[in-house]
């Protein structure tokens, strides 16, 4: 490669000269066309768009975190309510169980009393039936005994009337 200040470099046939001239012309055209300003503007636009996207992403993230915090708070509140509802339900079940036991005991007591009353009535009725049967039997036996005595010793009209009334009076 020939040195820049040597005469050989400045000859028209030297391709390195034309490469240098082309490079200088290219740089001049780029500067004249305001390419650096356009490139800087495009870079600034891209940077601004990226910054806007980052700001939007930060805003969305903040909203998502706030929403997540709200959802967590709602979930915790719901869990507290569920625990309270479960405790209330358990208390209600316990109260219902106590009431059901009391009602069952009361019903059993009433049925036992009713059964005892029926048994007492049946016993009283049976005793009354037995008494009535005994009275009837005693009256019949007395009537037969008196009839036999009267038949053996004669009959008196007053005694016959009294014997007829014995059965009705004993009952």
From Swiss-Prot:
Keyword annotations from UniProtKB, A to Z: ATP synthesis, Cell inner membrane, Cell membrane, CF(0), Hydrogen ion transport, Ion transport, Membrane, Transmembrane, Transmembrane helix, Transport
Main location: membrane
Recorded topology in the membrane: Single-pass membrane protein
Cystine residue pairs: none
Gene Ontology CC, one term: proton-transporting ATP synthase complex
Intracellular or extracellular location(s): Cell inner membrane
Signal peptide extent: none
UniProt GO molecular function: proton-transporting ATP synthase activity, rotational mechanism
Entry's transmembrane regions: 19-39
Quaternary structure annotation from Swiss-Prot or TrEMBL: F-type ATPases have 2 components, F(1) - the catalytic core - and F(0) - the membrane proton channel. F(1) has five subunits: alpha(3), beta(3), gamma(1), delta(1), epsilon(1). F(0) has three main subunits: a(1), b(2) and c(10-14). The alpha and beta chains form an alternating ring which encloses part of the gamma chain. F(1) is attached to F(0) by a central stalk formed by the gamma and epsilon chains, while a peripheral stalk is formed by the delta and b chains.
General function of this protein: F(1)F(0) ATP synthase produces ATP from ADP in the presence of a proton or sodium gradient. F-type ATPases consist of two structural domains, F(1) containing the extramembraneous catalytic core and F(0) containing the membrane proton channel, linked together by a central stalk and a peripheral stalk. During catalysis, ATP synthesis in the catalytic domain of F(1) is coupled via a rotary mechanism of the central stalk subunits to proton translocation.
Family the entry assigns: Belongs to the ATPase B chain family.
Name of the molecule in the record: ATP synthase subunit b
Source organism per UniProt: Caulobacter sp. (strain K31)
